[in-house]
């Protein structure tokens, strides 16, 4: 929200925030309900078919949370998990639910939850064997819940960008122009550093 606010100020526009779930945010842009979507969105081929993306403003890291003492000790061990928890619509969900021949684990081995917190709760209650989620929320969940740990190996590294309706080049160009200035003067880095790892 703070990056969006900084962009709006650069463009002389008023920011109206409509807080919604991840999938809903993507749909809202496609249907014209929202001008742009910012929710830790990463660019992938499926999303590029239905929306356009700004230049990247940060790099995110997906990690794996397990219970201490779990038989899952490395990312490779995820292949042996009976069930993996993720947040619906996120990159972790997309990667994990992809067919095995596409390096995923298949939809039968993945449960998508409405939030990362619900996925972690499912892990605590032994409904899933592991949770794949962004690094920063993962650290907060592990800190708040005794008996959880993050695997040493990263699951995936990805670029975050802002989604706009396909073909809205005027808005996209304006956002990219503002982002360029905000990255150059350090504004984006100082905001992003509070929330996600941006290397």
Locate predicted features.
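Extracytoplasmic small-molecule ligand-binding "clamshell" domains
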Residues: 1-40
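Extended ligand-binding regions for polar small-molecule ligands
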Residues: 1-10, 76, 88-90, 161-199
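Alpha-to-beta junction loops
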Residues: 12-14, 30-39, 82-83, 115, ...
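Short helix-initiation/N-cap motifs at beta->coil->alpha
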Residues: 16-28, 71, 110-122, 158
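A ligand-binding cleft/hinge motif common to bilobed small-molecule-binding domains
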Residues: 24, 41-49, 95-98, 122-125, ...
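Periplasmic-binding protein-like
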Residues: 59-66, 135, 139-180, 196-199
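Flexible hinge/capping segments at coil-to-helix
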Residues: 66-83
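Ligand-binding clefts/hinges and TM-proximal coupling segments of bilobed small-molecule sensing domains
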Residues: 91-110, 146-151, 180-199
């Amino acid at each position: 929200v703070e990056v969006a606010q900084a962009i709006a100020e650069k463009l002389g526009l008023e920011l109206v925030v409509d807080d919604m779930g991840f999938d809903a945010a993507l749909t809202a842009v496609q249907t014209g309900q929202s001008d742009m979507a910012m929710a830790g969105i990463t660019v992938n081929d499926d999303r590029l078919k239905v929306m356009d993306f700004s230049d990247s403003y940060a790099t995110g890291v997906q990690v794996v949370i397990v219970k201490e003492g779990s038989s899952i000790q490395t990312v490779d061990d995820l292949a042996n998990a009976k069930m993996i928890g993720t947040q619906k619509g996120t990159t972790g969900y997309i990667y994990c639910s992809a067919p095995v021949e596409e390096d995923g684990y298949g939809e039968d081995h993945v449960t998508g939850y409405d939030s990362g917190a619900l996925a972690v709760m499912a892990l605590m209650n032994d409904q899933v064997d592991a949770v794949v989620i962004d690094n920063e929320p993962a650290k907060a969940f592990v800190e708040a819940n005794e008996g959880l740990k993050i695997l040493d190996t990263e699951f995936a590294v990805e670029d975050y960008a802002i989604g706009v309706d396909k073909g809205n080049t005027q808005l996209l160009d304006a956002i990219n122009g503002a982002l360029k200035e905000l990255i150059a003067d350090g504004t984006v880095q100082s905001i992003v550093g509070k929330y996600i790892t941006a290397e």
